[in-house]
Amino acid sequence: MIDKSAFIHPTAIVEDGAVIGANAHIGPFCIVGPQVEIGEGTVLKSHVVVNGQTKIGRDNEIYQFASIGEVNQDLKYAGEPTRVEIGDRNRIRESVTIHRGTVQGGGLTKVGSDNLLMINAHVAHDCTVGNRCILANNATLAGHVSVDDFAIIGGMTAVHQFCIIGAHVMVGGCSGVAQDVPPYVVAQGNHATPFGVNIEGLKRRGFSREGLVAIRNAYKLLYRSGKTLDEAKLEIAELAEKHPEVKAFTEFFERSTRGPIR
């Protein structure tokens, strides 16, 4: 179903069954598959391909040669009906690729809202990208990666499969991330190692002075105290009882399977 207020360029192909919302814009030479849903006000600039069971929210801007919902690169994939979901107000720049999930990974690749995916960024099968994240040029997420809210991943950075990039993390460019990055941390290098707390980013997002001090103390317990990881976890949990900002660390530890970068 195509809303009567949507614009479809004469050279675009919108297959029967696709749902195109009000005031959406499908530019020249775009291809929209039969199981695709595109929300109100979303713009496909030109030469964009959206395929598979893909749902895109409202007011997104998707630039030329982006490919969304295409068959993933997992060798186990055998054509199962897996999905891609994208939220609202994202900017998805030229040649970005977002692949559909796998049955083994839950069947869903998901991107939240208000994100910026710069040129050539890649979001592999079963990844989850939160809200207000930035993936810079050529940033690459392997399968099953989680990127939490407000995280920034620098250009040319590769993230190993199943890794977690915590909330408010800043990963420097040209890095290789092979373990989980705790929230609030600046990471850099190959393999990526911690370089302190993302203080400037947290200030811009309105964190209080007291909250910043608590986050720094949690970071020091994890990385500067000489304690074992289990010992640091216990003390960080105690700190989290007094400072809600620190709870992000304890929640991260519960999810982490690859262990924090060291």
UniProtKB/Swiss-Prot annotation:
Signal peptide: none annotated. The keyword Magnesium does not apply. Its EC number is 2.3.1.129. Its main location: cytoplasm. It is found in: Cytoplasm. It catalyses: a (3R)-hydroxyacyl-[ACP] + UDP-N-acetyl-alpha-D-glucosamine = a UDP-3-O-[(3R)-3-hydroxyacyl]-N-acetyl-alpha-D-glucosamine + holo-[ACP]. Pfam families: Acetyltransf_11, Hexapep. One of its GO terms (biological process) is lipid A biosynthetic process. Belongs to the transferase hexapeptide repeat family. LpxA subfamily. Involved in the biosynthesis of lipid A, a phosphorylated glycolipid that anchors the lipopolysaccharide to the outer membrane of the cell. Homotrimer. This is Acyl-[acyl-carrier-protein]--UDP-N-acetylglucosamine O-acyltransferase. It comes from Salmonella heidelberg (strain SL476). The lineage of its organism: Bacteria, Pseudomonadati, Pseudomonadota, Gammaproteobacteria, Enterobacterales.
